[in-house]
C-alpha cells in the first residue's frame, strides 16, 4: 500500500485518542479552558457517566465570533505565543481539546464576549462543523458534549460503568477545585446529588476551607500548614497529622503552578518526609502546591498534561521533604490530640439491669455457706502490696503540673497505660510507644552529633543463627557500629555481640539481632544509607524502650511525660501509632450526656 496523507477527520480522531481517553478527560479539558478564561464560577453537569451528555458553563471572558471559528481547528490557541513554549502559565496551551472532542462526539459551543452585541453558537459532529449562528447567552461560555465516542464506537467498549465514569469525573473536578479555591464550582448529574463549593477567601485560610469541604472535616481538623521557599521555588499547602492516613496514596494531591499532576518525584518526597511517622502499609493525606518559574518546569510531557518534568528536581524534592518535616515536627505533640474525638460517638452507656432484676440471683451473691469473697475483700486483694500491680493511690498534683501540655500523672492501668490529668481533661499515654519515640529521637540525635556511645560487654553475647542471616548481619556490621552495636562473625552459624548502645541499657541482644535481621531481609539493596540507618534506629528504639507490663512509679511516669514534652514528634511512635489520646472535659461530658 503506498504512503498517503490521511484525511483531516481521521487525523483528528487519532489525536482525540491521546487527549480524550474517557468522559473525565473531556471534563478536565473543558474546565481548564474555563479557568484559563478567567471564570469565577463553573457549573458541571453529566449524564450517563458522561457518555450521554456533559455540560460545562462558566462566566469567563467568552470568545468573539472570529475566535470561535478558530477554536475548533487543531493547534489554534489564544494561550501561546510563537516562542512562549517554555513559559506556559495556563492550564491548556496546545489548542487540541475542542477539535479532539468534536471529532468523536456531538459538540455544541455557545459563547459571548463582552465586545460582542450577542452570543454566538457553533456545532461540530464527528469533525463536521456547522456555520456559526447568533445565539442567546448573558456572559461566558457554555459547552455541551453529547453522545461521546459515537464516531469511534470501539472506544465505548473500554469505558467502565456509568457509576465508575461519574466518579472519575468527580475526582477530576475535585482536584481542579482544590487548585483554585477562588473559583466557585457546582457539580451535578443524573448519578449524584448536586455539590457546590463556594469561592473561598484568598490565602491559606481560604485554601484550608476549600480543602476541608472536599477532603472532609477530619482533614481540616488534622491539617498542618506547611511552607518552604528556596531559589524561587515555593512549596506550600496542608499535610494531615500522621494519625489520619489511608491504605493507598490516593489521598495525596499535588499541584505544580496550579496544575494537578501525578509526579513520582513528589510522591517519593512525601513518603520520605513521613517515613518516621507511618508504618509501611499506610499513606499520608496531603495537598501540596509547588510554585516556580514556568521556565523551570516542562508541562509538555504528557498529552493529558498530568505529568511534569523539573529542571532542578533535587531542589524540589529537598524542599518538599523540608517543608513537611518542619511542619510535622512543629506540631509533633498535636498529631494525636484529635484521636479521641473521632471515637467518642462509638461509646454507648453501659447497659443497665432491668427494673425487675433480682440482685440476689446474681452468680456473685453468696448462697448459703458460699465462700465467695465480698466486694471489700476483692478490693483489698487488688491493692495488696505484694501483688504485681502499679501503685494507683492518688498522687498529689501541683497546679503547675496541670498546666503542662501532658499534665500530671495520676495512675497507671494494666501496667501499660499512664493516665494523666490536665487543666482541661485527661490524657491516656501508651508508655511503650511514648518511650520508643524518645529513644528513637535520641539515637538519631547522637548519630548526627558525635556518634552513639557504646557500652562494652564483659562477656560477649553469642547469638546462634542460620548462615544466611549471619552473612546478612555481618555485611551491615559497619552500619550497625554507627549506632553502637558492634558485632562480628563467630563461626559459620553465630554472631558475637561485643558492644551495645549505652542508650538501650541492659538489652536482649539476641532478640535485637533477630529483629534487625528480619528487617534487613526486606530491604531493597537500592535503599539509601540514611533510610537503612533510620530503620536500624527504629528497631533499636523498640527494643530499648519501656515495655508494656512494667510497673512505673509516679516519679517515673511524670519523668516520661516531661521527656515527651521535650521530644520532637512525640505524638506517634516509630510505627505510626499514636503515643497518647486526649479526652477533653467536653468529650467526657458528652459521654455522660451532659452536652
From Swiss-Prot:
Keywords: DNA damage, DNA repair. SMART domains: DNA_mis_repair, MutL_C. NCBIfam families: mutl, PRK00095.2-4. SUPFAM superfamilies: ATPase domain of HSP90 chaperone/DNA topoisomerase II/histidine kinase (SSF55874), DNA mismatch repair protein MutL (SSF118116), Ribosomal protein S5 domain 2-like (SSF54211). This is DNA mismatch repair protein MutL. One of its GO terms (biological process) is mismatch repair. GO terms for molecular function: ATP binding; ATP hydrolysis activity; ATP-dependent DNA damage sensor activity; mismatched DNA binding. The gene is mutL. This protein is involved in the repair of mismatches in DNA. It is required for dam-dependent methyl-directed DNA mismatch repair. May act as a 'molecular matchmaker', a protein that promotes the formation of a stable complex between two or more DNA-binding proteins in an ATP-dependent manner without itself being part of a final effector complex. Coiled coil: none annotated. One of its GO terms (cellular component) is mismatch repair complex. It holds the Pfam family MutL_C. CDD domains: HATPase_MutL-MLH-PMS-like (cd16926), MutL_Trans (cd00782). The keyword Transferase does not apply. Belongs to the DNA mismatch repair MutL/HexB family. It comes from the Bacteria. The keyword DNA damage applies.
Amino acid at each position: 500500500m503506498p504512503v498517503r496523507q490521511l484525511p483531516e477527520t481521521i487525523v483528528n480522531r487519532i489525536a482525540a485518542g491521546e487527549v480524550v481517553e474517557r468522559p473525565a478527560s473531556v471534563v478536565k479539558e473543558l474546565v481548564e479552558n474555563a479557568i484559563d478564561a478567567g471564570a469565577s464560577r463553573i457549573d458541571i453537569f453529566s449524564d450517563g457517566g458522561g457518555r450521554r451528555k456533559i455540560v460545562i458553563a462558566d462566566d469567563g471572558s467568552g470568545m468573539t465570533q472570529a475566535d470561535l471559528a478558530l477554536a475548533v481547528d487543531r493547534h489554534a490557541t489564544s494561550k501561546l505565543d510563537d516562542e512562549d513554549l517554555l513559559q506556559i502559565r495556563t492550564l491548556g496551551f496546545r489548542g487540541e481539546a475542542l477539535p479532539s472532542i468534536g471529532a468523536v462526539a456531538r459538540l455544541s459551543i455557545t459563547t459571548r464576549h463582552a465586545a460582542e452585541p450577542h452570543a454566538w453558537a457553533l456545532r461540530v459532529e464527528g469533525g463536521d462543523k456547522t456555520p456559526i449562528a447568533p445565539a442567546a447567552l448573558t456572559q461566558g461560555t457554555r459547552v455541551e458534549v453529547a453522545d461521546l465516542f459515537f464516531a469511534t464506537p470501539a472506544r465505548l467498549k473500554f469505558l467502565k460503568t456509568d457509576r465508575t465514569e461519574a466518579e472519575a469525573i468527580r475526582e477530576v473536578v475535585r482536584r481542579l477545585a482544590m487548585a483554585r479555591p477562588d473559583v466557585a464550582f457546582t457539580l451535578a448529574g443524573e448519578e449524584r446529588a448536586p455539590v457546590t463549593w463556594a469561592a473561598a477567601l484568598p490565602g491559606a485560610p481560604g485554601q484550608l476551607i476549600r480543602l476541608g469541604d472536599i477532603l472532609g472535616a477530619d482533614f481540616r481538623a488534622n491539617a498542618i500548614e506547611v511552607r518552604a521557599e528556596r531559589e524561587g521555588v515555593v512549596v506550600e499547602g496542608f499535610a494531615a497529622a500522621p494519625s489520619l492516613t489511608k491504605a493507598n496514596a490516593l489521598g495525596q494531591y499535588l499541584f505544580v503552578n496550579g496544575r494537578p499532576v501525578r509526579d513520582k518525584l513528589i510522591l517519593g518526597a512525601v513518603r520520605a518526609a513521613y517515613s518516621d511517622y507511618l508504618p509501611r502499609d499506610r499513606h499520608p493525606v496531603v495537598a501540596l502546591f509547588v510554585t516556580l518559574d514556568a521556565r523551570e518546569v516542562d508541562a509538555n510531557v504528557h498529552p493529558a498534561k498530568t505529568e511534569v518534568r523539573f529542571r532542578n528536581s533535587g531542589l524540589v524534592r529537598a524542599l518538599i521533604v523540608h517543608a513537611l518535616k518542619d511542619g510535622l515536627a512543629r506540631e509533633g505533640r498535636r498529631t494525636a490530640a484529635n484521636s479521641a474525638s473521632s471515637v467518642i460517638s462509638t461509646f454507648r452507656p453501659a447497659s443497665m439491669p432491668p427494673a425487675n432484676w433480682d440482685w440476689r440471683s446474681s452468680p456473685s451473691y453468696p448462697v448459703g455457706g458460699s465462700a465467695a469473697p465480698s466486694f471489700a475483700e476483692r478490693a483489698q486483694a487488688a491493692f495488696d502490696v505484694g501483688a504485681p500491680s502499679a501503685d494507683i493511690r492518688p498522687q498529689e498534683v501541683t497546679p503547675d503540673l496541670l498546666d503542662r501540655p501532658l499534665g500530671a500523672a495520676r495512675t497507671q492501668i494494666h501496667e501499660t497505660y499512664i493516665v494523666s490529668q490536665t487543666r482541661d481533661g485527661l490524657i491516656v499515654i501508651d508508655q511503650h510507644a511514648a518511650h520508643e519515640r524518645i529513644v528513637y529521637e535520641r539515637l538519631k540525635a547522637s548519630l548526627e552529633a558525635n556518634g552513639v556511645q557504646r557500652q562494652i560487654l564483659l562477656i560477649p553475647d553469642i547469638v546462634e543463627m542460620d548462615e544466611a542471616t549471619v552473612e546478612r548481619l555481618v555485611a551491615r556490621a559497619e552500619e550497625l557500629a554507627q549506632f553502637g552495636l558492634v558485632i562480628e562473625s563467630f563461626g559459620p552459624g553465630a554472631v558475637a555481640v561485643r558492644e551495645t548502645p549505652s542508650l538501650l541499657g541492659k538489652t536482649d541482644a539476641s532478640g535485637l539481632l533477630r529483629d534487625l535481621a528480619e528487617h534487613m531481609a526486606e530491604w531493597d539493596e537500592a535503599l539509601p544509607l540514611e533510610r537503612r540507618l533510620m530503620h536500624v534506629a527504629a528497631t533499636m528504639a523498640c527494643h530499648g524502650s519501656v515495655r508494656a507490663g512494667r510497673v512505673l512509679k509516679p516519679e517515673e511516669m511524670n519523668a516520661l511525660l516531661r521527656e515527651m514534652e521535650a521530644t520532637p514528634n512525640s505524638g506517634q511512635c516509630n510505627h505510626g501509632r499514636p503515643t497518647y489520646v486526649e479526652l477533653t472535659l467536653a468529650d467526657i461530658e458528652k459521654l455522660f450526656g451532659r452536652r
